[in-house]
Amino acid sequence: MLFGRQAYVGLSSGQYGSLTLGRQYDSAVDYIGPLTVGDLWGGTFGSQPGDINNFDNTLRTNNSIKFSSRSYGGLTFGGVYSLGGVAGDFSRNQIWSLGAGYTSGPLSVAAAYLNVRNSNVSFFGTSSSTPLTAATTNMTSPVYSGYASAHTEQVAGAGVNYTIGPATLGLVYSNIRFLALGNTAESGPNPGRLSGDATFNNIETSFLYRLTPAFSVGLEYNYLRGNPTNGRSSSQYHQGTVGVDYALSKRTDVYVIAAYQRASGTDSTGKTAVAAINGVTASSSNAQTAVSLALRHKF
């Protein structure tokens, strides 16, 4: 399993598409992911706080079956189903997702839906069949780790990119819901004794400009809001990201990415919200900065 990401086998047909089995990305990653800043130029830092919608493919689906269609005049679609692996309970720990994308000239659009049962175990855990204890919390980001007891996690999103000459404009929206909190027997701990649902809404706006074929600059603003839950105030995360890339050759480039995030309100753990840029440990304060400078060679 190369770097722990994907490992799968399957069949492919130029007439219908492909059918694969193994450890794979979900449909939100496949269809919306390519339109996000994290995939295009911003890397891990350019993704949402804690990669809450998994558009940056932090998590994969194990024991999954995936269908990916061929392109029908620019339209592609597909779905993923991951077996829960619990004897006698077919739906427990199951994961399924659907997605579609369309590309025509300068326009690219996509939409996807992800449904995860007992996500603290099935998605964030290393194995859906690992025994659960009362203290098992596989979620690490304080943005949502307090919702480990959710029976179901849902992600619904859509995105669009439009290119005008050397400029590309991007907009991505996602709604993330942790449903039926308090399911400690199957999902995870609930120290805050929460009940009901927790909902987040995220908007990512971006602008990429190619000054020359080799030199590009990207800007992003991301806003994540967690709705009030169980009498707690809402949480809000504002992030700005800047990226500069210079291609030294067809396979080698040097880039710098800088992100700044500021948080407010009450996070999922019931504490004052702290900044949580994706890819680094959450801050101990409400503000955080992350900078990456790298030389990249593609093999």
PLM region spans:
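Residues that define the transmembrane beta-barrel architecture of outer-membrane proteins
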Residues: 3-5, 59-63, 92-96, 103, ...
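Outer-membrane beta-barrel "beta-signal"
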Residues: 248, 285-299
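Outer membrane beta-barrel
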Residues: 1-84, 92-114, 259-263
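Detector for outer-membrane/organellar transmembrane beta-barrel domains
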Residues: 101-241, 297
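Structural signature of outer-membrane beta-barrel domains
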Residues: 26-30, 84-86, 116-119, 176-180, ...
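Flexible, solvent-exposed coil segments and beta strand-coil junctions
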Residues: 44-47, 75-81, 135-141, 185-188, ...
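Outer-membrane beta-barrel and related beta-rich outer-membrane complex signature
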Residues: 31-37, 121-125, 181-185, 231, ...
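Secondary-structure transition into beta-strands, especially the periplasmic turns and strand N-termini
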Residues: 12-19, 71-75, 103-108, 162-169, ...
